[in-house]
Amino acid sequence: IRPLLPQRADTVVGPGDDCAVVRVAGSADDWLFTTDPVIERRHFLPETPPRLVGRKAIARAVSDVAAMGGTPLWILVDLVAPAATPLARIRGLYAGLIAAAEKWNLGILGGDTAEGDTLELHITGVGRLPRGSAVLRSGARAGNFVYVTGALGGAYLPGSRHHLLFEPRLEAGRFLAQHKFATAMMDLSDGLAADLPRLLDASRRG
């Protein structure tokens, strides 16, 4: 898909990183844009508490912004749900969304709703960071060490809720970006084994 998409002059980083980076003339900041789906039976189970589904949806977008070294500011929420979805379940989803937005100081600007065969949340996140300071996937160099900011494999432990309750590494991302300690960063929501080759590919080091 990526080669099919035209790029504008104000797009610093387009498809292929954790966030797109857009530069607005006269602004001291660059702007970050990301979008993430959370789909039933793909990212959560029917029996997953809806509040945790809402939290996970926002945490994924926040984690993308953290991986660039930025600060998340706003989100848009699209809900797709079967017509028979109980209202209590919808309320639970939004209770989780609202609690997560408050936790990470995000404004919920709105969104859209649609009827569909599967319960889905689609989050669009907007953030910012100082102009020119984004840490990209494409910056890895020969001889770099690979570090992670948390424990690996937690989502695979029996009964684990790590994939629902993980904490985006906002402070670590900003610190690493501000002090230029990292040449490349990325979110590891798909696991190190899946994501490290993507970083190497983006950096042409694979």
Regions from the language model: what does each represent?
Residues 1-206:
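Helix-biased detector of long, well-ordered alpha-helical tracts
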